[in-house]
Amino acid sequence: MPQQIELRNIALQAAQPLVHGVSLTLQRGRVLALVGGSGSGKSLTCAATLGILPAGVRQTAGEILADGKPVSPCALRGIKIATIMQNPRSAFNPLHTMHTHARETCLALGKPADDATLTAAIEAVGLENAARVLKLYPFEMSGGMLQRMMIAMAVLCESPFIIADEPTTDLDVVAQARILDLLESIMQKQAPGMLLVTHDMGVVARLADDVAVMSHGKIVEQGDVETLFNAPKHAVTRSLVSAHLALYGMELAS
């Protein structure tokens, strides 16, 4: 399995250019946060990595490399990169139970799909009464439960990399805390490389090792999390950090 995945000079376009020459490097055991406002190109960058661009959007330049060798996004999805999506409800077939979803995911990746394995993954993400959960349909579960189920699926995949696209969006504070605890646990136990897409600088401060700031389809600043919080250079980065500090009655040093 690869130890590093690199996005090199990715460019995306629809009727007009959307993403301009984005380069990112994911490394096993480290969390790279991709931050920026809505419409900055974060989710499109993730979609390009996985080969699931929306209709009408095409990649016009760039490549993806695994340990320095060019690779197709289709060869990464699921096997080498697990995904935790922004809207978990859209990721599940409403006609299938959680047992069917989990089992089919495992079988597609050549992983063990016995009930003991599925139960262990569900219990690992804090969903009580795994036997009952496996019988549930998506419409019978809350957003927080579905997000934890997506994390359980990522655990089952045992992929060396994870893309988590706004994993705490639209969740209440308690559910958000649980999801962040689970992501921390995965990093400690499995040490994948993680691309964490978020607009929440509190999430960045808690989980990230490195940060890339995106604005208008471009990476405007990259660095380790401590440097970025203590000495942001770009105006967009300074605005994000200042807004975060203001929540705690603090100001960014000039």
From Swiss-Prot:
> How does this protein sit in the membrane?
Peripheral membrane protein
EC number of the protein = 7.2.2.11
Chain ranges of the ABC transporter domain: 2-241
- Reactions this protein catalyses: Ni(2+)(out) + ATP + H2O = Ni(2+)(in) + ADP + phosphate + H(+)
**Per UniProt, what is one GO molecular function of this protein?**
ATP hydrolysis activity
Per UniProt, where does ATP bind? 36-43
Q: Where in the cell is it found?
A: Cell inner membrane
Enzyme class, one word? translocase
Going by the UniProt record, its keywords in alphabetical order are: ATP-binding, Cell inner membrane, Cell membrane, Ion transport, Membrane, Nickel, Nickel transport, Nucleotide-binding, Translocase, Transport
NCBIfam families named in the record? nickel_nikD
Q: What does this protein do?
A: Part of the ABC transporter complex NikABCDE involved in nickel import. Responsible for energy coupling to the transport system.
Instruction: Please report the name of this protein according to its UniProt entry.
Output: Nickel import ATP-binding protein NikD
